[in-house]
Structures are given as C-alpha cells and as structure tokens.
C-alpha cells in the first residue's frame, strides 16, 4: 500500500477515530485504527463500540491500495509535529510514514487480524439537529448510574416517536430532555451506553452538523457528516419513568434567585 494524504484533514479524522479506542483492550490489535485505502476509511472498534470515518476528501493519491494499522499514540504526534500539507503512508512489512520533516518506520500487526467493521444506517433514519442532540445528551447523561449492578440505568433511554425523548435516572434523580425530529420513522426505543454518547457529543462538536439515528433491537447507529458510529444497546428494561412524574394538568411557576438557589 502507498497513499498520499492531506495532513490536517487526515489528522482530524484519525483523532476522532482514536477517541473510541479502549485504553486496555482485550485484543492487542484493537489498540490500532485501521486505514483502508480501498474504501478510503478509518475504522476503530472495541467490539462494543465501532466507528468509521470517511476520509476520501483527505486522500490525494492512491499509488497502490491496501490496508494499514495506525497506532494513535505514535502516529498522531508524528502528524501533528511534522508540518507540510501532505504525508505519504506506505506499507510493506512495516508502516512507513514520510513527511516534510523526515521519515518514520513503525511496526504493526497484520491488518487482516483487525475485525471487520461494517456500519449500516440505510433504513428508518431519524434526523435531529446536532446542537439539539448534544444538548439532550448533556441534560441527561449526568443522571445515569454507571457503578451499580442495575445495568439498565447505566445509559440514557432514547425513545423515538413524533420526537426524541432522552431519559436517564440513577434511582434518585430523573432527567428528561426532548427535541424535534426531522421526518417520520417507526416508534422505537433503546438504552444507549454513556461512552458512545460522549463520543457522539465530541463528533457533533467537531463536525458541527446534523445527526441521523437508527435504533434496532440490539444496536444504535449515529451518522454525522462523514462519521458513522455504532454501539450495542444496554440490555435490560428501563423503569417506567412516566409513573414518577406528577400526573396533573395544573402548573405553577416558581421564581427564585439563581445564585441563592444554586448555593443550597
């Protein structure tokens, strides 16, 4: 494999893909991000959470196709510090990176050892503005319970209907946030783990675009621009949170001093 890429766009995508790499993976090969010159994608996974970044716009020239495994801890500093607009990435028995400031040779596992990462979000996509989704995540994720054995409370419940409803609780606190959806999709729900939602928030901040979501019985997919992220759902049944809320049509408005209220 021998490919020339634009340094800054490729680096940006590599940093996003590397953000989901587990610090202590069960399989050593999962410490790497796979660069597939055939599909022009970067792929990373921990077998629970997977990401695919389309880097076609960053690939300038493919002299010979193939695959490379990039160790983020080593490749990212090289791309940050080397300067120049373009970088050559080549694989023979080793990974070779040629930059404006010099060449680097790194060892890497066989790319064929990396698990296949395929993300399909072609059907029943629900669209939501990126800012609205990021706000909904921020307003609920703090109320999750990630430390107890009640695994169903370790994520945020996503209910898709005429709008998106996000719910989280740790048994003491209950947080609910709602936002509008674009288009009509079948009603569906699933519990999304905390770590994937943190990754989605980072992607929205980096890409600044809308998000398409697909939830099925076992997984959820989020697509933002050139980035697709797939996660397994949390198993278990989420509590009937609507029974916790007061069932009354009466409403009241309470005004208070924000500074004093927050100091209580």
Question: What is each residue range found by the language model?
Answer:
Residues 1-264:
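Structural preference for solvent-exposed beta-strand-turn elements
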